[in-house]
UniProtKB/Swiss-Prot annotation:
This is Major pollen allergen Bet v 1-D/H. Gene3D superfamilies: 3.30.530.20. It comes from Betula pendula (European white birch). Brassinolide binds at residues 55, 82, 84, 101. May be a general steroid carrier protein. The keyword Cytoplasm applies. One of its GO terms (molecular function) is abscisic acid binding. Pfam families: Bet_v_1 (PF00407). Its main location: cytoplasm.
Length: 160
């Protein structure tokens, strides 16, 4: 098994605490509403949202995958940190064992925040991660973030 890691940082004008509430803590409800072209629904399979929770994320018709299952590994409300692993569906299968993801939202002096995202692809055997997989993952994350950000800018009373 090999591990391929990539890290990205992206900024938002939304304060860290507000973005964490909307994007992370209530993302299962909010994201399908604001980005139905990317995620059609999220089902809680087991757990209460904390570590060990299993979620099924369903994608709309025409998407390359029908679903993925995520396992929540850590939710740190104080440091705005969220770790989860993609354990089934999507790209996980013959060549990938899982994808571990860490999101940390850090406040910036201007009142916005920086999202620091680390993704670790755990491959099976000698398989390598394709550049297209990484690109698609980055684009999906950016799409979801910008949809949530737009919603929060349009609804200043939400998630305060």
């Amino acid at each position: 098994m090999g591990v391929f890691n990539y890290e990205i940082e992206t900024t938002s004008v939304i304060p860290a605490a507000r973005l964490f509430k909307a994007f992370i803590l209530d993302g299962d409800n909010l994201v399908p509403k604001v980005a139905p072209q990317a995620i059609s629904s999220v089902e809680n399979i087991e757990g209460n949202g904390g570590p060990g929770t299993i979620k099924k994320i369903n994608f709309p018709e025409g998407f390359p995958f029908k679903y993925v299952k995520d396992r929540v590994d850590e939710v740190d409300h104080t440091n705005f940190k969220y770790n989860y692993s993609v354990i089934e569906g999507g790209p996980v299968g013959d060549t990938l064992e899982k994808i571990s993801n860490e999101i940390k939202i850090v406040a910036t002096p201007d009142g916005g925040c920086v999202l620091k995202i680390s993704n670790k692809y755990h491959t099976k055997g000698n398989h390598e991660v394709k550049a297209e997989q990484v690109k698609a993952s980055k684009e999906m994350g950016e799409t979801l973030l910008r949809a949530v950000e737009s919603y929060l800018l349009a609804h200043s009373d939400a998630y305060n």
